């Protein structure tokens, strides 16, 4: 009996993942049955689809090479140097494969859905909303379905292998944690590559089209429009999906590892603590589906009503999971189930608060963005100053929220035990992990609202280029404006969840170090602590490790690590900004060349060469993403080898603090500039084509790489540095 120790309730996990994938397939089929519209609409959708698929193909080629190289490195570390778990090379590959699949399915759906959404909007607003939202739901469900499936399969396999060993669960969870490396690497390329692609096209299209040639957005005369629309899919669907896939898996796996440690003394409780985060995620899938079916609206709905219908689905799912958590943890019989349930709720609430705060600072219904639009009366410089100021101030609420969530989830979990005993710390850390899982448990629907944005955006582009009637444009505009708000709150949510996940990963880093040291001791190594006694890693607590490695602020290694972490965040940002700048320059030159050399583009008589622009974006993105990506992987390895465990913990703390605040600042500045421009386009302060409008276009163009490249890429950086440290723990220990 291989499965005799797995409780029956565990099977909810694979069942939920299969249900999610089944429903995703159902939504995909029902979307494909809808009409795609006129021949012109079909033709434009085909252009975008080809471009998106060409990009994915190219990107996956590069990623495949990187994966093969890394898998060989891991295999060498595991089988030759024996400093790595032997399962890692395989787990790493499945993590990457599943994440890549999720991106592929999400993107395929989005590119098929845009024309159908535009066509649906010809009949009515509700029809358009449903097609776009349910197509977005395909992405959300595929991510949670594949993520949980990967986790469930590996848990069953490893459990069968290690069953009966005294440290079985610690070994299983620390092994599973390293698959996160596959999801992380995939996410890095999808987010950074996608971010560079989409903004090279967007900035190029805006600068030449709107500012120089005075043609509106999404005009078929602009050669970069198709690339711009492809970019929405590449960055916001595939990139966002891979980012949240990584947070989702990372939070569940690190929490399982923390649970194995927190309850190590009690075998039965330990197993329950390990599968608890997986079960919360599984129940979250069922509850997300309820929310997805609740999203609908009426004709002529106002923006407020539209937002309400999307918000209703998300909030109902969140409230249901809050209630369900109490039931799940009580039925699992986990000690202090009540406190842990409040940990989950603190994560859920933090997600909502950060989303709302993001909306406040970036939506033009509120003062901060209105003030930026007002500043356009004195030219672009004041618009930039105001936007940067707004972004910086906007970091306060998310940072305070995450801080409160950390404190609450930690102390609720350990029953407000202020003593720093080993038990209270490990239980508290488990609580923080559980909060991250809570925040991400309704990912099925929150990601659906995110992926909805680019689908609606592309539908608007399609309607504009196909020359559909005015009332259709008004409907797609309403859907698109809604999409921009959900995209902003979605970004806030992605950043918040990345921060909590990174924190849980940071906490589980010590577990990986512990396992690595036990492995080294088995191979005949002996550790002596500062007092000259033999240090035995196998029954040492988290505190003992912190003392053994002298992880405190008086240790210069920790301080230097923290400085390097903060610097890494800025360096990474700078590199991605520079990459967008360079890629946009080559795009601008290409668009100018076409206007010069292809006669009759501006009169609408000749068709521009869209393919060239798509190619430029694809090539730049591939070339430019290598350096920042390598940096993220190399820095933690070098710090581990030079400064040891203390240095790495400093690096991860500094990187998390700087990366989180920087990401919020960049995301919100960019979002506010974008919406200030939209506010003027709606007719305030002089309207379209005025000098004020041009000033806000400058702001929006600066904001593009802020909010869509550098900001979101930081989510990956803070998780990836923790992930790399975890995977390289064995190497760090070998050089002790």
What are the language-model segments listed below?
Residues 2-736:
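Hydrophobic packing and interface segments
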């Amino acid at each position: 009996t291989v499965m005799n120790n797995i409780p029956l309730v565990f099977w909810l996990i694979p069942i939920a993942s299969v249900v999610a994938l089944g429903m995703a397939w159902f939504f995909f089929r029902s979307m494909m049955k809808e009409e795609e519209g006129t021949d012109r609409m079909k033709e434009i959708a085909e252009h975008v689809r080809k471009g998106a698929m060409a990009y994915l193909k190219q990107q996956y080629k590069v990623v495949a090479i990187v994966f093969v190289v890394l898998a060989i490195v891991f295999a060498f570390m595991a089988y030759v140097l024996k400093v790595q778990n032997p399962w890692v090379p395989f787990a790493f590959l499945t993590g990457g494969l599943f994440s890549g699949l999720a991106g592929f399915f999400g993107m395929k759906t989005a590119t098929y859905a845009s024309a159908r959404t535009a066509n649906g909007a010809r009949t009515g607003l509700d029809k358009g909303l449903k097609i776009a939202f349910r197509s977005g739901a395909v992405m959300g469900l595929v991510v949670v379905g594949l993520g949980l499936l990967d986790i469930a399969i590996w848990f069953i396999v490893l459990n069968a292998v290690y069953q009966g060993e005294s440290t079985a669960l610690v070994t299983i969870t620390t092994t599973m944690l390293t698959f996160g490396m596959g999801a992380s690497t995939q996410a890095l390329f999808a987010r950074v590559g996608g971010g560079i692609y989409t903004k090279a096209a967007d900035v190029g299209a805006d600068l030449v089209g709107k500012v120089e040639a005075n043609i509106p957005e999404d005009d078929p005369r602009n050669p970069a429009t198709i690339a711009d629309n492809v970019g929405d899919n590449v960055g916001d669907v595939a990139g966002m999906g891979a980012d949240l896939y990584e947070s989702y898996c990372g939070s569940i796996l690190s929490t399982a590892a923390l649970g194995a440690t927190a309850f190590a003394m009690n075998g039965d409780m330990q197993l329950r603590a390990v599968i608890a985060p997986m079960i919360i995620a599984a129940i979250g899938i069922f509850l997300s589906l309820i929310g997805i079916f609740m999203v609908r609206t009426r004709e002529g709905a106002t923006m407020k009503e539209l937002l309400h219908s999307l918000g209703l689905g998300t909030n109902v799912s969140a409230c249901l999971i809050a209630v369900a958590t109490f039931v799940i943890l009580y039925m699992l019989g986990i000690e202090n189930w009540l406190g842990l349930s409040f940990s989950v709720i603190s994560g859920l609430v933090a997600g909502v608060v950060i989303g709302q705060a993001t909306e406040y600072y970036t939506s033009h219904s509120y003062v901060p963005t209105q003030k930026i639009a007002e500043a356009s009366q004195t030219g672009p410089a004041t618009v930039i100053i105001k936007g940067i100021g707004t972004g910086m101030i906007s970091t306060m609420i998310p940072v305070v929220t995450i801080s409160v969530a950390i404190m609450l989830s930690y102390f609720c979990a350990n029953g407000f035990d202020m003593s720093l005993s080993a038990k209270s710390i490990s239980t508290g850390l488990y609580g923080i992990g559980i909060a991250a899982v809570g925040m991400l448990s309704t990912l099925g629907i929150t990601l659906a609202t995110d992926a909805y944005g680019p689908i609606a955006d592309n539908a608007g582009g399609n309607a504009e280029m196909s020359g559909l009637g005015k009332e259709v444009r008004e409907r797609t505009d309403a859907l698109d404006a809604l999409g921009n708000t959900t995209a902003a709150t979605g970004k806030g949510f992605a950043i918040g969840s990345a921060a909590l996940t990174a924190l849980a990963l940071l906490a589980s880093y010590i577990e990986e170090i512990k396992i690595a040291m036990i492995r080294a001791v088995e191979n005949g190594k002996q550790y002596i602590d500062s007092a000259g006694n033999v240090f035995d890693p196998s029954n040492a607590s988290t505190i003992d490790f912190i003392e053994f490695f002298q992880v405190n602020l008086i240790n210069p290694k920790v301080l230097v690590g923290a400085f390097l972490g903060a610097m890494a965040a800025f360096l990474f940002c700078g590199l991605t900004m520079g990459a967008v700048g360079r890629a946009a320059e080559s795009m601008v030159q290409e668009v100018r060349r076409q206007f010069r050399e292809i006669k009759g583009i501006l009169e609408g008589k000749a068709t521009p060469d869209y393919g060239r622009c798509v190619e430029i974006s694809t090539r730049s993105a591939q070339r430019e993403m290598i350096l920042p990506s390598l940096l993220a992987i190399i820095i933690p390895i070098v710090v581990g080898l030079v400064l040891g465990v203390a240095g790495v913990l400093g690096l991860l703390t500094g990187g998390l603090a700087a990366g989180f605040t920087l990401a919020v600042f960049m995301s919100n500045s960019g979002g506010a500039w974008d919406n200030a421009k939209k506010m003027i386009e709606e007719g305030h302060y002089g309207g379209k084509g005025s000098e004020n409008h041009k000033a806000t276009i400058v702001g929006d163009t600066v904001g593009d790489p802020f909010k869509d490249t550098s900001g979101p890429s930081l989510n990956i950086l803070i998780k990836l540095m923790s992930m790399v440290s975890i995977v390289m723990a064995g190497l760090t220990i070998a050089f002790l």
